[in-house]
Amino acid sequence: MSEPADLHAAVLEALVGEFGRYKRTAERALDQLRDEDFFVRLNDRQNSIYVIVKHMAGNMRSRWTDFLTSDGEKPDRHRDDEFIEQSVPREQILRMWEEGWQCTFAALSELREGDLLKTVTIRGEPMTAVSAITRQVAHYAHHVGQIILIANHIKGPDWKWLTIPPGQSETYSRRMQGK
């Protein structure tokens, strides 16, 4: 493999890895919730986890469908509707979540050497594909953080930590360095 191909593969692997890490982390938070918890709003200006998931799924479908060949803001996306609360079953929420991620990973798996430097557009704004992808990593990380914050708030003392629990950093570091 050539150096550019190696770099392309390494960058793409790192980006896909980050998307996967955020997906898994959010799912570990979602798994802790009761059905009704998906609709809790911390205040009247905050979104529920359901709305965040619906928004992320809509964004993923729009951004990743025909990623290299069409604007990332599809004409049939109604973004404002993503922020409307509805009562839907947990299974439907998780299906939206999974379909959004499937669209994301499918688009990323189709990228080939040289594609990261191609120009794509989002809302008419041109950028390199790698810029658009890193923008999405940041966007999804933001919303995954919101999901975790809300879930942690809901669960209170029953929250199961998704990362190193408070007071466990030194033990964790010693264990990892001993591997």
Place the predicted regions along the sequence by residue:
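Short, solvent-exposed, charged loop/turn and helix-capping segments
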Residues: 33-36, 111
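Short, contiguous alpha-helical
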Residues: 2, 16-23, 27, 35-81, ...
